């Protein structure tokens, strides 16, 4: 059993080092497509929970990951690309990589939005210093959920499933990357 855990952790470390490099660039040819997907995700989340409007109006900035793909069998990984807005203007692109270990199996895609309460938190994200286990703090988008949501250390996280199914009782973290436009 110890050997399996060691291998799982080693795999998680390797994936954690390699996956962020896959989404490291802001590709101007794909920029319009990424922005369109992000705007579609925002519209879908606002339809699902109109109370999200307050976060869009009052946050300093936010990042929208329209499609994060996640797959797992004991060791899990997820990766997605997003679009970053600061003070209402598109600032650049982002990537998210997640690694988890535990009882989990399946595959799914979902959308995720991170709202930054203030400039300090937004700057941490842009500098690559924002890393946390958001799955515990994330709010599932459904009617009225955002009304009771709040910032945790300057960040509010909302997720909405789009495709697939997964059984997940794991622990892990997220690492974010930012590329200015």
Residues of each region from the PLM?
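Small-residue-enriched, tightly packed secondary-structure blocks
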Residues: 24-181
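Bacterial N-terminal signal peptides that target proteins for export
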Residues: 1-9
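Mature exported/compartmentalized surface modules and terminal targeting/interaction regions
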Residues: 2, 19-23
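Bacterial N-terminal signal peptides
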Residues: 8-20
């Amino acid at each position: 059993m110890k050997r399996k855990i060691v291998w799982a952790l080693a795999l998680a470390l390797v994936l954690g080092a390699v996956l962020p490099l896959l989404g490291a660039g802001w590709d101007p040819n794909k920029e319009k497509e990424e922005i369109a997907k992000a705007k579609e995700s925002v519209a879908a989340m606002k339809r699902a929970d109109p109370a999200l409007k307050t976060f869009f109006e009052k946050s300093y900035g936010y990042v929208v990951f329209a499609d994060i793909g996640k797959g797992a069998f004991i060791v899990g990984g997820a990766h997605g690309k997003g679009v970053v807005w600061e003070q209402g203007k598109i600032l650049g692109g982002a990537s998210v990589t997640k690694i988890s270990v535990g009882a989990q199996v399946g595959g799914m895609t979902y959308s995720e939005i991170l709202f930054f309460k203030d400039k300090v938190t937004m700057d941490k994200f842009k500098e690559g210093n924002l890393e946390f286990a958001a799955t515990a703090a994330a709010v599932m988008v459904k009617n009225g959920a955002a009304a009771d949501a709040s910032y945790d250390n300057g960040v509010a996280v909302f997720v909405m499933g789009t495709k697939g199914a997964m059984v997940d009782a794991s622990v892990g973290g997220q690492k974010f990357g930012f590329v200015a436009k």
